[in-house]
Amino acid sequence: MGFTDKQEALVNSSSEFKQNLPGYSILFYTIVLEKAPAAKGLFSFLKDTAGVEDSPKLQAHAEQVFGLVRDSAAQLRTKGEVVLGNATLGAIHVQKGVTNPHFVVVKEALLQTIKKASGNNWSEELNTAWEVAYDGLATAIKKAMKTA
């Protein structure tokens, strides 16, 4: 069964996240670093900081991650697969030393952040839609990493 219109709508219903981008960006990266402290060095905007601090670069990167997942949801519904619009994503992830466990950590942080942002609107169905969309994106990035 392919990605449905309803699943895409659930992924795109993240207005709560957009309304508090600074707070949820900090939460997202805090969860990433709690799960994988060594990942701090993978993010240029976190390298020289004592912890996760709000910054335009942090917010921009978080919005990019969430935006890529939303785009993946649309592609999964229309094409059944995710094709990266940014051909350099694979090379960037290789250059940074990203490995398979990093994708798991980011997925867990993403899902926890969405759960917090969704509040009473959170559901297993919402969680699954985001998870499937993220998995599609991760698969596309890993594929691009192999050819980078």
Swiss-Prot record:
Binding, O2: H61
Binding sites annotated in the UniProt record for heme b: S44, H93, K96
UniProtKB keywords: Cytoplasm, Heme, Iron, Metal-binding, Nitration, Nitrogen fixation, Nodulation, Nucleus, Oxygen transport, Phosphoprotein, Transport
Modified residues (Phosphoserine): S44
InterPro entries: Globin (IPR000971), Globin-like_sf (IPR009050), Globin/Proto (IPR012292), Leghaemoglobin-like (IPR001032), Leghaemoglobin_Fe_BS (IPR019824)
Protein location: Cytoplasm, Cytosol; Nucleus
Induction: Strongly reduced levels in boron-deficient nodules. Inhibited by abscisic acid (ABA) in parallel with lower nitrogen fixation in nodules.
GO terms assigned for molecular function: heme binding; metal ion binding; oxygen binding; oxygen carrier activity
Function statement: Leghemoglobin that reversibly binds oxygen O(2) through a pentacoordinated heme iron. In root nodules, facilitates the diffusion of oxygen to the bacteroids while preventing the bacterial nitrogenase from being inactivated by buffering dioxygen, nitric oxide and carbon monoxide, and promoting the formation of reactive oxygen species (ROS, e.g. H(2)O(2)). This role is essential for symbiotic nitrogen fixation (SNF).
Entry similarity comment: Belongs to the plant globin family.
Protein name: Leghemoglobin-1
Organism this protein belongs to: Pisum sativum (Garden pea)
